[in-house]
Amino acid sequence: MEELDGEPTVTLIPGVNSKKNQMYFDWGPGEMLVCETSFNKKEKSEMVPSCPFIYIIRKDVDVYSQILRKLFNESHGIFLGLQRIDEELTGKSRKSQLVRVSKNYRSVIRACMEEMHQVAIAAKDPANGRQFSSQVSILSAMELIWNLCEILFIEVAPAGPLLLHLLDWVRLHVCEVDSLSADVLGSENPSKHDSFWNLVTILVLQGRLDEARQMLSKEADASPASAGICRIMGDLMRTMPILSPGNTQTLTELELKWQHWHEECERYLQDSTFATSPHLESLLKIMLGDEAALLEQKELLSNWYHFLVTRLLYSNPTVKPIDLHYYAQSSLDLFLGGESSPEPLDNILLAAFEFDIHQVIKECSIALSNWWFVAHLTDLLDHCKLLQSHNLYFGSNMREFLLLEYASGLFAHPSLWQLGVDYFDYCPELGRVSLELHIERIPLNTEQKALKVLRICEQRQMTEQVRSICKILAMKAVRNNRLGSALSWSIRAKDAAFATLVSDRFLRDYCERGCFSDLDLIDNLGPAMMLSDRLTFLGKYREFHRMYGEKRFADAASLLLSLMTSRIAPRSFWMTLLTDALPLLEQKQVIFSAEQTYELMRCLEDLTSRRPVHGESDTEQLQDDDIETTKVEMLRLSLARNLARAIIREGSLEGS
């Protein structure tokens, strides 16, 4: 189980008086609102806040960096690819795939670092330039740590190849030598350049002995007096035993050869062969692994881990992984010499050399400004089966916890939240719940964004979230008087109550305007019209109008009558339906049968005789309004005439 840490670091918010007790906090997915709630009472009726400001505190400001957004976007694809690596792969094939994924992550970090470096150089504002330079340093440290973790935890390099990997690691991250080399070689007389011996020394410190020999040949050409000792030094560099990638010799053979070579170097030192050249003698002491000679080159080494790798190269080139922590700690102590304390980066690298993965992740979580690094590194190490036994004290595992934190930060951004969805998908314990909580807080500014969110929810069968989003969009559409859109969203939400509300608005608009809006939607409701009685009535009433327009009068009359007798039509709409029957009653051909006419009469009498009930304004208007009275009289007259015609017609048909 993970041990509990000590007290968390206190973060002071500029402008907020932390000594006051009354503070209000409100947490969001990626930020927090803070304001003071203490008031100074001036008068009984007036309360004035002492600090009338609301502060927004963001925990992941890096998501708003344009360059770092590329890091997040490109690493997202690598992350998804890693999740799909076949679990059945084992041995070298699986290891090679995991190493390839690690290198892909590093290449993305390096690309962002180089772009950030260019932006820092081009920045006109000094403050921005410093900010970009600081970000470059952070990205550089991230790649440095990741590369070391790749060597120690993913490649798991054994003794021999381990040192070759560490040399490549140092050469990649201590790259000032390349610009220095170009400067020296570009001069008219390289061996007389002020930095010539510094360059040769750095090349030796980095184990680039072939390049160092080439530089010494220039010294030999320019100074015949020292040509002999330069040639001897060159031979020592050439014959130094190093385990190359394609070499088949065993570690024992390498150690024997290295021992003989080391003894030869000792003899040259004892014989004072290079006494006439302090520079060459210093190089010989370095190649003998003399710690004092190495520490004299502190400025050229620049950091303790460069000192560590050089020290191993010339004193224990077949170092075993298990012994690294001893050399790392002693190298750090020797290099700092008690003059300064280790930096956070030093502690992280030291933890890596001690093979303490969890301490590496913990230190990185504290030191780095966002969760990207620890989330992706931990996920990769988890795929290497290195974190299986580590659970956090609150029940989740470390991988999932860090991925959840990273994804939560992405949801604070207006567009990067889409990446966060996939990270939640690959958190089996709490990912689904977290996604549900975060996706409900996404501001649905546009319908296009809403459709994206909706599609994500539907793909994951998040029924409640789908319903909630559709309701929100339906309400927005109603407020904007877009009834067609509102009805569409309420149907999609399967919200019967809201569908009824929108249907009533459609019917009210029809009464006011005499026509329907959004006919295409109403005409194509299909089975969706069964969601609510009012929606069914709306669809069927529109169908009545369509039949009437197509002169299918008998079908239209039957449908109109069924809408009234089935009581599916709202009572407030009966007068409109009866008025719609008037043109059918006045047709030359008898449309309504005698029985149907009686039904219409019963509906009319039921409507006019019923006592007014609170809220039914249509009934009140029916009794009070002269226009409504005229309508009733016209209906009664038309119904009576139609009844007479229907009886005569039906009687004549029976007689024949």
UniProtKB/Swiss-Prot annotation:
The modification N-acetylmethionine is found at residue 1. One of its GO terms (molecular function) is structural constituent of nuclear pore. One of its GO terms (biological process) is nucleocytoplasmic transport. It is found in: Nucleus, Nuclear pore complex; Chromosome, Centromere, Kinetochore; Cytoplasm, Cytoskeleton, Spindle; Cytoplasm. One of its GO terms (cellular component) is cytosol. The keyword Cytoplasm applies. The modification Phosphoserine is found at residue 223. Its main location: nucleus. Component of the nuclear pore complex (NPC). Component of the NPC Nup107-160 subcomplex, consisting of at least NUP107, NUP98/Nup96, NUP160, NUP133, NUP85, NUP37, NUP43 and SEC13. Interacts with NUP160, NUP133 and SEC13. Interacts with NUP37, NUP107 and NUP43. Interacts with CCR2. It is linked to Nephrotic syndrome 17: A form of nephrotic syndrome, a renal disease clinically characterized by severe proteinuria, resulting in complications such as hypoalbuminemia, hyperlipidemia and edema. Kidney biopsies show non-specific histologic changes such as focal segmental glomerulosclerosis and diffuse mesangial proliferation. Some affected individuals have an inherited steroid-resistant form that progresses to end-stage renal failure. NPHS17 is an autosomal recessive, steroid-resistant progressive form with onset in the first decade of life. This is Nuclear pore complex protein Nup85. It comes from Homo sapiens. The gene is NUP85.
